[in-house]
């Protein structure tokens, strides 16, 4: 893939123009800032390609919409990951006629998948209109129409993270313990480093030694610098990291914050303090405030999105652990009730199992 630094205009890597743009790599947009090569980090990795990296896009097999090989592999993993959610919904369409019973079964299946009452009602209302317009007569056709409706509902969530409008771009990451926050930051670091971005990590999760160590491992693996302080003040660590990022000409500063529940008011206030202190270090920062949510938690994830957004003003989401859950419908609930962009979704432990979110791909993988 081509790097981001030095691009003179906003650019989506490996993007395909149009609604069904499929990106082989994470879609990271380089903003118009153009030239922003910082100081080189010491000790460049001996081998630029780590063993757990997916192979570069190979020649795609002939098909209507050529997809890079890596994205084909991703689609297969996404489909497998969403099978639990998808099968309960697609089973509704195995009958021979379209009647009230079909719609009732579909309503139950969508609610069981944690789609939520509002999104379920909206999808069913839209589906009945589509069925009428298309004069559809068999359930298989209805399933295809539902996939179209779901893709349209999810469309507002599809957005690329923009890097390069500010130097450094400061990304603050929050999430409850167990959501996969630190791992997601590690994977994001790998993506950014692979796209020639100079990254600095801030271990502001100072309470959990394991979190600092985990982040340290990712820093070593990706040959990026890390600002860490045992038992230090999280806000102070964040301030130091942003200041260091500016001084060292970094492209991105990623701030890992302590995992917490939205009900822990004093901890939420601490997050707000970290955000304020980041702004003191850089008046325009943080440029992104991301929340990592566990897809397995279903409707609970939606409550987290609402609570963290109220406290911090979220700019994007990373939805992890969508593999093996029966609650993949939660993305539709988020789209209906709190449409904050989903920058990445995860369906596994591997680095390549975190990819950019594409509404149509997701709908097809779920209902295919």
Residue ranges: model-predicted function:
Residues 1-149:
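Non-catalytic terminal/linker segments enriched in charged/polar, low-complexity residues
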Residues 118-121, 147-368:
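P-loop/Walker A NTP-binding module and the surrounding RecA-like catalytic core of P-loop NTPases
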């Amino acid at each position: 893939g081509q790097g981001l630094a030095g691009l003179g205009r906003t650019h989506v890597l490996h993007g395909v123009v149009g609604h069904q743009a499929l990106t082989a790599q994470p879609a990271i947009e380089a903003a118009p800032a153009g030239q922003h090569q910082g100081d080189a980090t010491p000790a460049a990795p001996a081998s630029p390609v780590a063993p757990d990296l997916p192979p570069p896009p190979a020649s795609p097999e002939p098909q209507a919409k050529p997809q890079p090989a890596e994205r084909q592999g991703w689609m297969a993993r996404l489909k497998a990951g969403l099978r639990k959610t998808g099968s309960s919904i697609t089973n509704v369409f195995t009958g021979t006629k379209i009647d009230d019973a079909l719609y009732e079964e579909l309503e139950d299946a969508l609610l069981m998948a944690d789609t939520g009452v509002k999104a379920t009602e909206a999808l069913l209302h839209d589906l009945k209109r589509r069925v009428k317009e298309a004069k559809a007569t068999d359930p298989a056709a209805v399933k295809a129409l539902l996939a179209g409706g779901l893709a349209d509902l999810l469309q507002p969530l599809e957005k690329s993270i923009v890097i390069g409008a500010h130097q450094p771009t400061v990304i603050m990451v929050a999430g409850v313990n167990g959501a996969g926050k630190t791992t997601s930051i590690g994977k994001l670091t790998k993506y950014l480093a692979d796209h020639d971005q100079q990254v600095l990590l801030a271990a502001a999760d100072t309470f959990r030694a394991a979190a600092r160590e985990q982040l340290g491992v990712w820093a070593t693996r990706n040959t990026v610098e890390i600002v860490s302080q045992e038992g230090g003040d999280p806000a102070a660590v964040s301030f130091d990291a942003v200041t260091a990022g500016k001084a060292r000409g970094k492209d991105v500063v990623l701030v890992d914050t302590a995992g917490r529940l939205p009900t822990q008011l004093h901890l939420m206030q601490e997050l707000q303090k970290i955000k304020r202190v980041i702004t003191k270090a850089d008046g325009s920062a943080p440029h992104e405030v991301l929340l990592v949510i566990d897809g397995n938690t279903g409707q609970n994830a939606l409550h987290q999105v609402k609570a963290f957004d109220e406290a911090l003003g979220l700019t994007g989401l990373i939805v992890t652990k969508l593999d093996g859950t029966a609650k993949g419908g939660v993305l539709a609930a988020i789209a209906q009730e709190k449409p904050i962009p989903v920058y990445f979704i995860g369906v596994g432990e591997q680095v390549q199992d975190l990819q950019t979110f594409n509404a149509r791909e997701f709908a097809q993988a779920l209902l295919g």
